[in-house]
């Protein structure tokens, strides 16, 4: 159970890092926002879902 929680947290950290680096680059690049808008929204939704799943799973571990 703890290993699964550690895996979820690791994925959350990696996705957070990718969003912190990627979103500003997309916003600064001219014309890139229109092409990557769906990817940014999908990634943000995945991040939010992963936060909820990790929090729910954490309540079972402790």
From Swiss-Prot:
GO terms for biological process: photosynthesis; photosystem II stabilization. The keyword Cell membrane does not apply. Pfam families: Ycf9. InterPro entries: PSII_PsbZ, PSII_PsbZ_sf. The chain crosses the membrane at residues 8-28, 41-61. Keywords: Chloroplast, Membrane, Photosynthesis, Photosystem II, Plastid, Reaction center, Thylakoid, Transmembrane, Transmembrane helix. The keyword Secreted does not apply. GO terms for cellular component: chloroplast thylakoid membrane; photosystem II reaction center. SUPFAM superfamilies: PsbZ-like. Belongs to the PsbZ family. May control the interaction of photosystem II (PSII) cores with the light-harvesting antenna, regulates electron flow through the 2 photosystem reaction centers. PSII is a light-driven water plastoquinone oxidoreductase, using light energy to abstract electrons from H(2)O, generating a proton gradient subsequently used for ATP formation. This is Photosystem II reaction center protein Z. It comes from Guillardia theta (Cryptophyte).
């Amino acid at each position: 159970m703890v290993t699964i929680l550690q895996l979820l947290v690791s994925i959350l950290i990696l996705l957070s890092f990718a969003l912190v680096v990627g979103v500003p680059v997309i916003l600064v690049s001219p014309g890139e926002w229109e092409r990557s808008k769906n990817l940014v929204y999908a990634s943000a939704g995945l991040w939010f879902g992963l936060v909820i799943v990790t929090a729910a799973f954490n309540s079972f571990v402790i």
